[in-house]
A protein has these predicted regions:
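N-terminal and secondary-structure boundary signal
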Residues: 1-171
Length: 171
């Protein structure tokens, strides 16, 4: 469905490494361009969403990749999805999951702030040892699966299908 301007719109930033390596993380000019366009189109509730990994510090990555600089200049709010005050809550997809029910046998959890909002995935196009190529949908991986998302690498393609189903349900 189309984005709605009167609700929160998350810009899901990709931080693959806390050090700046071109093409590893969302480029600052990508955040700048997308946010400016959305603002011109009447989207005033923009929130940059970041997440860490088991090896990446999202606060350090936000600063080193110049995301914070752009977000501050544009007056964007930001959240770190895997740090307080953000809570992860149980979520039961209505769509049949291909693999996530098997991988996460104790249930799926998603950020409490996501349901009922818009999301714009800011992709990177890079290679990955397990996923071959990554892009916008792979970026949903960090926003919808918590710290143990690497458990899904062996079934990554099916995982991405499941995540698309969840994303369609909650955004």
């Amino acid at each position: 469905t189309a984005l709605t301007a009167d609700i929160n719109t998350f810009l899901k930033v990709n931080i693959s490494w806390q050090h700046y390596y071109p093409a590893c993380s969302s480029a600052p000019w990508q955040i700048d361009g997308v946010a400016q366009k959305l603002k011109r189109d009447g989207f005033n509730k923009l929130i940059a969403a970041h997440n860490g990994t088991v090896v990446v510090d999202p606060i350090e990555g936000r600063e080193n990749n110049k995301h914070q600089l752009v977000e501050d200049r544009l007056g964007l709010d930001h959240v770190v999805l895997d740090a307080p005050p953000i809570k992860w809550v149980p979520y039961r997809p209505t769509a049949k999951m291909l693999v996530l029910d098997d991988v996460y046998q104790d249930g799926l959890y998603i950020p409490e702030v996501f349901p009922g909002t818009n999301i714009v995935q800011l992709p990177t196009v890079k290679t990955h040892v397990f996923t071959t190529m990554t892009g916008a949908l792979k970026n949903a991986f960090g926003g919808l699966l918590h710290r143990y998302r690497h458990w899904t690498h062996s079934v990554i393609h099916e995982t991405l299908v499941d995540l698309l189903q969840i994303q369609k349900e909650i955004h």
